[in-house]
Amino acid sequence: MNQFTHINTNGEANMVDVSMKQETVRVARAEAFVSMNAETLQMIISGNHHKGDVFATARIAGIQAAKRTWELIPLCHPLLLSKVEVQLEALPETNQVRIESLCKLTGKTGVEMEALTAASVAALTIYDMCKAVQKDMVIENVRLLHKSGGKSGEFNAE
């Protein structure tokens, strides 16, 4: 079994030293879903929400969050991201919004946390913008879809 990389031999949390690691292209994709009533989803789709374009706001929030992950998650490294994408898709058949994020850089550590943070904050932004209309929305199934680059190789969710 692999060891936790952020815990030293004394059991103390520390930031991982990546100074001797090779720079490689790192890519990560993550997703999240927001489940809601059909009426709430239709309000988002039609653009009739009184706060404005929900998808545009959530997209920008997700991008901003990816760039600030190191400030939110203890022990994450500040990264020079070369690409952040946040895609939002309305799924009327399940009354959900699907969010997919992609983060990319050339560096010494991965971008999984940045991708997960982007998807999560985009979902939280949808909730925030729509909570006046519906408070029982559910943010669910936040997960890493893909990561590549680095010593640990490639990962693809099933």
Swiss-Prot record:
It holds the Pfam family MoaC. Homohexamer; trimer of dimers. NCBIfam families: moaC, PRK09364.1. InterPro entries: MoaC, MoaC_bact/euk, MoaC_sf, MoCo_biosynth_MoaA/MoaC, Mopterin_CF_biosynth-C_dom. Keywords: Lyase, Molybdenum cofactor biosynthesis. PANTHER family: MOLYBDENUM COFACTOR BIOSYNTHESIS PROTEIN 1, MOLYBDOPTERIN COFACTOR SYNTHESIS PROTEIN A. This is Cyclic pyranopterin monophosphate synthase. Its EC number is 4.6.1.17. Substrate binds at residues 75-77, 113-114.
